[in-house]
Amino acid sequence: MTDLPQAEGGCGAGNERLAAQAAAAGNAELMARFKADYPVGPHDKPQTMCPAFGALRVGLRMRRVATVLCGSACCVYGLSFISHFYGARRSVGYVPFDSETLVTGKLFEDVRASVHDLADPARYDAIVVINLCVPTASGVPLQLLPNEINGVRVVGIDVPGFGVPTHAEAKDVLSGAMLAYARQEVMAGPVPAPISGRSDRPTVTLLGEMFPADPMVIGAMLAPMGLAVGPTVPMRDWRELYAALDSKVVAAIHPFYTAAIRQFEAAGRAIVGSAPVGHDGTMEWLANIGRAYDVSPDKIAAAQNAFGPAIRGAIAGAPIKGRITVSGYEGSELLVARLLIESGAEVPYVGTAAPRTPWSAWDKDWLESRGVVVKYRASLEDDCAAMEGFEPDLAIGTTPLVQKAKALGIPALYFTNLISARPLMGPAGAGSLAQVMNAAMGNRERMGKMKAFFEGVGEGDTAGIWQDTPKLYPDFREQQRKKMEKAAKLAKAEEMI
């Protein structure tokens, strides 16, 4: 094994530097693919949690699949902790390394030995190996791992923070890799049927994680057209990959699954964007799915007539009144905004950390036609500026945005835990948001009282418990500011050289 270059600066180095090191270490094609699939935003590093968490979570949720991490110990500790905090019920594999094993190539040998030790067909259908920042930047070649050991599939992927901007897109990295593997298996010959069996009707594969009841609601809406709901990607079982590829139509509920969509298109499958959210969204989505399957117009109309009035009734029975800004990193932010607007809310701004893709174009156009500012690859700074500028009755967003909103006395809800944890599709989703939204907006007066009560206790670096009144040292602040400006100018000058 030839010596591998060591990633200088570790995972604390800048994105451009790590990406350049990865390209120099033999991962130029990988970095080019990441750049095309997941275009970066205005910020240097991901503003969500470590992107690898997304791929790790997908692997840990799958039955008979082992997941192994290769990265810095601190990163693996954090990823293991947060995975189990969110309910993982199995161990995370870890291949440790030091500077010597990384540079000499011994790390790859250790990874290969670990995979061989794990490859027990009685326990596993597949083993997923994930390179984190440092091994990717150093060029640890997971593509040289065997495709199969003792009948156990081996899937190696790189999920560096300097190539994959959000943990939501890391789910796509692993989903795309597994679909690519499964597609090769299908092309090679017969494959096992899913444990749940095959539907006797044509199916529609759903792309993107969603509330557990949503696929069932979608299935009910497809039934009048003679269609059935298929597997949901990311999936929970390897055999479901075959069933997902077997569907002639794929619904890109979450539109950022670029790698997965590439595999479906390679298999000749039609992709339909948007989702059956709200009345307008559901009517258009059912029509697009029906046309993709060459369903007769009368059957499409039957499905629309069966659910359109119910959705209108649910929306009318659960109105939402107030100005709401929406932001997050799940990829469903535009769908939520649509539902809020149909429910009566004023939504001046939608920010999503996900990139712009063709599969969200209809949602974007619908929102912009109603005066909504839609921002893809929105940074925390974008979302906070929108919140401060529009002064909403309610701000929906990530944890730091919620924290800032509450400090300003603005009611706020965390998107991931309080919005994604509710049904959005069809009649079930139409009235699902009103109670929590209206209750949160009703807290404005109480938050104002709390803000007034704590006025003057300090904030930022003067917050907390002090023995005396905290001293601000403005001279020291100014001195440090000048040092930082000087360092920034020097760094820019070096780049130009």
UniProtKB/Swiss-Prot annotation:
GO biological process assignments: light-independent bacteriochlorophyll biosynthetic process; photosynthesis
GO CC aspect terms: plasma membrane
Pathway: Porphyrin-containing compound metabolism; bacteriochlorophyll biosynthesis (light-independent)
Membrane topology: Multi-pass membrane protein
Reactions the enzyme catalyzes: 3-deacetyl-3-vinylbacteriochlorophyllide a + 2 oxidized [2Fe-2S]-[ferredoxin] + ADP + phosphate = chlorophyllide a + 2 reduced [2Fe-2S]-[ferredoxin] + ATP + H2O + H(+); bacteriochlorophyllide a + 2 oxidized [2Fe-2S]-[ferredoxin] + ADP + phosphate = 3-acetyl-3-devinylchlorophyllide a + 2 reduced [2Fe-2S]-[ferredoxin] + ATP + H2O + H(+); 3-deacetyl-3-(1-hydroxyethyl)bacteriochlorophyllide a + 2 oxidized [2Fe-2S]-[ferredoxin] + ADP + phosphate = 3-devinyl-3-(1-hydroxyethyl)chlorophyllide a + 2 reduced [2Fe-2S]-[ferredoxin] + ATP + H2O + H(+)
Key word Cell membrane present: yes
Subcellular location: Cell membrane
Main location, first listed in the record: membrane
Pfam families per record: Oxidored_nitro
Annotated GO MF terms: oxidoreductase activity, acting on iron-sulfur proteins as donors, NAD or NADP as acceptor
Chain's role: Converts chlorophylls (Chl) into bacteriochlorophylls (BChl) by reducing ring B of the tetrapyrrole.
Membership in a protein family: Belongs to the BchN/ChlN family.
The protein's name: Chlorophyllide reductase 52.5 kDa chain
Natural source organism: Rhodobacter capsulatus (strain ATCC BAA-309 / NBRC 16581 / SB1003)
